[in-house]
């Protein structure tokens, strides 16, 4: 499984803006192809996760993130927009799936 360099966070560019590409607009049928296309330009892959409760859409899930991790060494940032009841279990599941950074949308 490809993984980013252990010091990926410390090695982010300091002389330009960081390019964090959202996978929301990727073609789900060709997700691996889209991840490969943007790899030379993306510092981080951004994956929004919505549960249909906290946020109205259903977006991405741990198994899909695990598949992305299998084809990409680009760091993966998970943005959780989910209900409190499942927050801790989702953090664990996305960490196990290969997330390198997890942020929580709080209100």
Task: Please identify what each model-predicted range represents.
Residues 105-106:
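Short beta->alpha connector loops at strand-helix junctions that form conserved
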Residues 2-96, 101:
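Conserved N-terminal beta1-alpha1 strand-loop-helix module at the mouth
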